[in-house]
Amino acid sequence: MKRFKKVYIEITNICNLHCSFCSPVNRKKEFITLDNINHIFNEIKDYTDYIYLHVKGEPLLHPDIDKIIELADKYNLKVNLTTNGTLLKEKINLLLNKTNLNKINISLHSENDKENYLDEIFEIRDNYLKDKTVIYRLWTLNNGKFDNNSQEIVEKIINHYKLSTDIVDNIYNKNNINIDKNLYIDKDNEFEWPSLNNNVESNGYCFALKTQIAILVDGTVVPCCLDSDGKVPLGNIYKESFKDIVEGEKFNTLKKSFEDRKPSSELCRKCTFKNKFN
């Protein structure tokens, strides 16, 4: 078994939506080059089998998304794609016949003005992606309930797929629900992006650096996909080898602090997402 269950790779930090729960990007806006992504794949190929092409940004905005997936295949890397779905219809031809495209997570939002947004997503999934695992991601309030806008999305899913009463009940009572062949609903509470401005600090365990690690578009290696501004840099994969980074002092000091449930990083202490694991 390889060291990491997954590696997040940010191929762009540019997004075409401005959702209220998503923190703004305070870094230079850019797209990764094919040379740089090829370098990253070569560096990480012995450390994971699965890559997620996002930290921040909408991956389908990348003009070479098809070439990136094809490059990953040369390194036997399986690709999990997370998208807001608004560009699926426009870019679907670039995703077809990609045997290493393992899973597509579609984060369903009410915060866009695109007409027939959900209808387009349903159409693309039903006509082109039935052989792929597709997950409709829904966000709930902290009490696990849907707000009015999310409830409308749920009702459209129920009506489109003509879901049975049992499946509908599961949507409200469970977090991961199989609603059709290779099609799932995954729901989770909206979370607060970690920030040094957060007032609350806490100790606790985290899976960062044990099962996952992330690489920002500028090459900065960070503990997880929630360090969206690179506040906990462990190194830069364009300047040093991935091997040296994961065997380095910064990496191992932080990893041990997670194991001891006393994060050495201020950002990690102020991250509330780790409370899910404690």
What kind of feature is each model-predicted range?
Residues 128-138, 156-201, 226-276:
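C-terminal accessory region of radical SAM enzymes
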Residues 106, 111, 125-159:
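Conserved strand-turn element in the central/C-terminal portion of the radical SAM core barrel
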Residues 209-211:
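Short loop/turn microsegments at loop-to-beta-strand junctions
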Residues 45-46, 92-114, 151-179:
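Structural recognition of alpha->loop->beta junctions
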Residues 1-104, 112-119, 278:
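Conserved alpha-helical substructure of the radical SAM core
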Residues 215-216:
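Short, acidic, Ser/Thr-enriched surface-loop or helix-capping motifs
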Residues 15, 19-22, 206, 224-225, ...:
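Short cysteine clusters
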